Amino acid sequence: MSQDLQKEVASRKTFAIISHPDAGKTTITEQLLLFGGVIRSAGTVKGKKSGKFATSDWMEIEKQRGISVTSSVMQFDYNGSRINILDTPGHSDFSEDTYRTLMAVDSAVMVIDAAKGIEAQTLKLFKVCRMRGIPIFTFINKMDRQGKMPLELLAELEEVLGIESYPMNWPIGMGKELAGLYDRYHRVIEQYRSEEDERFLPLGEDGDLKEAHAIQKLLYYDQALEEIMLLDEAGNDFSRERIIAGEQTPVFFGSALTNFGVETFLRTFVDFAPSPSSHESNEGVIEADNPKFSGFIFKIQANMNPAHRDRIAFIRICSGEFERGMNVTLTRTGKSMKLANSTQFMADDRETVNRAVAGDIIGLYDTGNYQIGDTITNGSKKLEFEKLPQFTPELFMRVYAKNVMKQKHFHKGVEQLVQEGAIQLFKTWRTEEYIIGAVGQLQFEVFEHRMRGEYNSEIRMEPIGKKIARWVKEEDADEKLSTARSMLVKDRFDQPLFLFENEFAINWFNDKNPDIELTSLL
């Protein structure tokens, strides 16, 4: 790989933004896009009545509900770095999509609501990041409102998540009393709602302001200095190595809604965030600077442009250089393909991409060739990156087309939405009626909404009373083993499994059939 290409790869910063719903994830994404010069003004998820919606919330149902249910991909340049942001679903029902997205990034930004602290979804996603060793940067949001005390939030972060923290800045006041941020890293105080020439006040070697200022008369100023002194004496030492190893999280305070502390966060993040790193494969570790092009598909999205009914496969480039028109091998099938139609994104806006390098996320127009987890490369034809996680559904519905004359629309919609991986498809053993599985109720609502809006197919869904899926070997697939509490079905790959009513039904099945092994996904 040439030095120029190595430099280009090193400039890539590819990260996901994770949070519990309503922590302000989409708002901070908007502000980052603002600093990247991509948008002129930030939309707001809360501004539904005005008809303004967030740039990253592009799907119709997201605009209606004010939640992210798909992973948007956005790219911009900032301070010499190429930023690739993946805005992940904030709703817990879409954890599968989020987990797959976390396989495609080099770091994560965790957004926490200052009033609520660590919430269930945050904890879940954090654990996945830790499992993968992904560096985590923490942004404690909504400091313009009353919330938990900063020291309490730090203690919660360390106790609940089990990770060292290092506050890069520290709030002076909170809510209506918010006056500024004491920036430990840049050695300045960033004032809240100040004139531009007074926004940053330099600190002296003693930790106080170099020159006298009105902010020093505030009660909260002295309190902040005392807390900073406590952090200096008893807190963790700053360690870039531990940050990169995912063992220490730099913590930033701010307010995404009022755009306070966000640009400082972005500037610091670009300095620290890791460049594209290596990926595990069946042929060993593939380094980002390997000259051979390789990548994997972590997401498939249908109807990003409803007028064209198209489908896009999102690929994370792991090594080498992509050039439009290049020939690659889809290693799952061994098929040679020409990558002529490629695109990059700003939520639903897109432009043709002629060239990209390791760390970039690009979209490939898909006519049905790709599956989530596929590896493509112009190197070894047997290369396969590690498998992406798939989850066992916990809710199941039988699904029918209301209008039998529109079966074609129905089948196409089900097929495409299942290939996206947002919902799983099963079929009854003999009659092959459709059963869809999900990890949460919202997935069914989104599925029904998209079937109607994107495929002109009204559907009827009926619960089947089964909650647990367990796969069996083909030789154990005997319909006679089905009971009122268990049902033999097959998945989209025709693999047999039983759907059980509850744990009691599984135990009963195991007692009656001790030689049959039941297995689950994640």
Swiss-Prot record:
UniProt cross-references to InterPro entries, sorted A to Z = EF-G-like_DII (IPR053905), EFG_III/V (IPR035647), G_TR_CS (IPR031157), P-loop_NTPase (IPR027417), PrfC (IPR004548), RF3_C (IPR032090), RF3_dom_3_sf (IPR038467), RF3_GTP-bd (IPR041732)
Q: Which residues form the tr-type G domain?
A: 10-277
Gene Ontology molecular-function annotations: GTP binding; GTPase activity; translation release factor activity, codon nonspecific; translation release factor activity, codon specific
| Cellular location(s) | Cytoplasm
Which CDD domains does its entry note? RF3 (cd04169), RF3_II (cd03689), RF3_III (cd16259)
Q: An example of a Gene Ontology BP annotation on this entry?
A: regulation of translational termination
What cellular-component terms does GO give this entry?
Answer: cytosol
| Positions contributing to GTP binding | 19-26, 87-91, 141-144
- Which keywords describe this protein according to UniProt? Cytoplasm, GTP-binding, Nucleotide-binding, Protein biosynthesis
Query: HAMAP family given for it?
Result: Rel_fac_3
Task: Return the similarity comment.
Answer: Belongs to the TRAFAC class translation factor GTPase superfamily. Classic translation factor GTPase family. PrfC subfamily.
Annotated NCBIfam families? prfC, PRK00741.1, small_GTP
Write out the function statement from the record.
Answer: Increases the formation of ribosomal termination complexes and stimulates activities of RF-1 and RF-2. It binds guanine nucleotides and has strong preference for UGA stop codons. It may interact directly with the ribosome. The stimulation of RF-1 and RF-2 is significantly reduced by GTP and GDP, but not by GMP.
What's the protein called, per UniProt?
Answer: Peptide chain release factor 3
Q: Which gene encodes it?
A: prfC
